[in-house]
Amino acid sequence: VISRKGAQFACIDIKNFYLDTPMEDPEYVRIKITDIPEEFILEYGLAGKEDKNGWIYFEIRRGCYGLPQAGILANNLLLGWLEEEGYYEAHSTPGLWRHKWRPIQFCLIVDDFGVEYVGIEHFNHLLTLLKKYHQIQTNMAGDKIAGINVQWKFPGRWVRIDM
């Protein structure tokens, strides 16, 4: 970023990345009614729905935390959307993405994007694409990505990174 004339840096975080991902086939889980908080039992009308051994059965249709395939399903969907819009992963650097012709590149860490761009319209192109599918949060100062604090001085062409 500091070596590219006119470049800026911003961060994008996809909210509920795994939770928004539809699954090709549903999964099933059973949970003891005694392990479910009373407030959830009341809110979802679960009282009396348990079997004779106290189990309640659920069908999972969207990704959820703890589901082994949730990460790969979410990631595959995201990569497909990016590729459809002209983004591609750099051959030499896994996790670094570029666009075929736009002056933009980003590192992708699960659901966090560290975006270098020249011209806000190119950043907005990526932003619009992601907003089609997910709720997102942007950090235009680009001062925090994946738990890393970043200090930028673009005119002085220096950056400080700390954790």
Over which residues does each language-model region extend?
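Long, low-complexity, charge-biased intrinsically disordered regions
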Residues: 1-163
